[in-house]
């Protein structure tokens, strides 16, 4: 662990570089185009279907 005390700044530079690179890549994402081309999620299997009829919640009027 002695090398960590000597070369901590190199590790810090690598981490800062990774964060800056990630920010640059996230800026390139076109959110509107992504949301327009997003695939539909398939319906999920409801494992609680047999208990759905036994709800204790009050009915909405």
Curated annotation (Swiss-Prot):
<keyword id="KW-1003">Cell membrane</keyword>
<keyword id="KW-0472">Membrane</keyword>
<feature type="compositionally biased region" description="Acidic residues">
    <location>
        <begin position="49"/>
        <end position="61"/>
    </location>
</feature>
<feature type="transmembrane region" description="Helical">
    <location>
        <begin position="3"/>
        <end position="23"/>
    </location>
</feature>
<keyword id="KW-0812">Transmembrane</keyword>
<keyword id="KW-1133">Transmembrane helix</keyword>
<dbReference type="Pfam" id="PF13980">
    <property type="entry name" value="UPF0370"/>
</dbReference>
<feature type="region of interest" description="Disordered">
    <location>
        <begin position="38"/>
        <end position="61"/>
    </location>
</feature>
<dbReference type="GO" id="GO:0005886">
    <property type="term" value="C:plasma membrane"/>
</dbReference>
<dbReference type="InterPro" id="IPR020910">
    <property type="entry name" value="UPF0370"/>
</dbReference>
<protein>
    <recommendedName>
        <fullName>UPF0370 protein Spro_3503</fullName>
    </recommendedName>
</protein>
<feature type="compositionally biased region" description="Basic and acidic residues">
    <location>
        <begin position="38"/>
        <end position="48"/>
    </location>
</feature>
<comment type="similarity">
    <text>Belongs to the UPF0370 family.</text>
</comment>
């Amino acid at each position: 662990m002695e090398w960590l005390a000597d070369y901590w700044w190199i590790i810090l530079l690598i981490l800062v570089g990774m964060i800056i690179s990630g920010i640059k890549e996230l800026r390139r994402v076109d959110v509107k185009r992504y949301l327009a081309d997003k695939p539909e999620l398939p319906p999920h299997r409801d494992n609680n279907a047999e208990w759905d009829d036994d709800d204790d919640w009050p009915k909405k009027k």
